[in-house]
């Protein structure tokens, strides 16, 4: 298929951020008496917004999930990301290749807040590829797994969502891309399992950004 545009998720696709974010989340849950490993935290929360998991969090901490707590989480998370964020291996070449193939019609469509996304992309030298074409699920009526952020990105690029390629790394994000009508390829950073990604609707799973190419 000749794709007219490529829409990227951010966390876990462009930047290696998910373990950093979940490390902060795990520490803050432990302060409230809910203990889990980093791996358990990632299994529960990667691909989801914290607010969307309110019922689960309150059931396990016994404490209301307040706006003040969320703000503290965002602040602590941002400090760690600014200090430790890195790009996914080989992603700069992949993004440049896809931008050239699609005549610059590439965008970021993230479930995360805009400040976080733009800060991370600047830190790793990817922001210029996407300047003016960064979309946040926090600014949409609904976030992933709903398709709103992908539909907004496609509309801005003036392309049919069905002619877009979406690059994702979680079942929740894949579901959003599929719901938008796009074809979804999933990046599975080893040792991530492939089956949940295929089950969610990914047409292809790849394990290295060096192989993300269009003919």
Task: Specify the residue positions occupied by each region the protein language model found.
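A metal-dependent, Asp-based hydrolase signature
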Residues: 46-79, 97
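Asp-based, Mg2+/Mn2+-dependent phosphohydrolase catalytic module
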Residues: 1-4, 96, 113-215
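Short beta->alpha linker loops
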Residues: 20, 45, 49, 86-90, ...
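Conserved SAM-binding loop
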Residues: 14, 87, 106, 166-167, ...
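Short, acidic loop-to-helix structural element flanking the phosphoryl-transfer center
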Residues: 2, 79-108, 114-118
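Active-site neighborhood of HAD-like aspartate-dependent phosphohydrolases
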Residues: 1-43
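Anion (oxyanion) recognition and catalysis
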Residues: 30, 99-100, 178
């Amino acid at each position: 298929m000749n794709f007219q545009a490529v829409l990227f998720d951010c966390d876990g696709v462009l930047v290696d951020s998910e373990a950093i974010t979940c490390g902060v989340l795990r520490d803050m849950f432990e302060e409230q008496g809910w203990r889990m490993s980093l791996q358990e935290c990632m299994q529960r929360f990667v691909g989801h917004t914290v607010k969307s998991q309110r019922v689960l969090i309150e059931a396990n901490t016994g404490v209301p999930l307040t706006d003040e707590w969320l703000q503290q989480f965002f602040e602590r998370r941002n400090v760690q990301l600014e200090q430790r964020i890195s790009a996914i291996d080989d992603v700069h070449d992949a993004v440049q290749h896809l931008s050239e193939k699609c005549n610059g019609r590439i965008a970021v469509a993230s479930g995360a807040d805009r400040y976080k996304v733009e800060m991370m992309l600047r830190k790793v030298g990817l922001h210029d590829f996407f300047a003016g074409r960064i979309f946040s699920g926090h600014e949409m009526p609904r976030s992933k797994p709903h398709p709103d952020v992908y539909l907004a990105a496609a509309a801005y690029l003036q392309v049919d969502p069905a002619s877009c390629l979406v690059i994702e790394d979680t079942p929740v994000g894949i579901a959003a891309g599929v719901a938008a009508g796009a074809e979804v390829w999933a990046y599975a950073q080893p040792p991530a399992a492939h089956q949940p990604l295929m089950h969610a609707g990914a047409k292809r799973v790849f394990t290295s950004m060096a192989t993300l190419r269009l003919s």
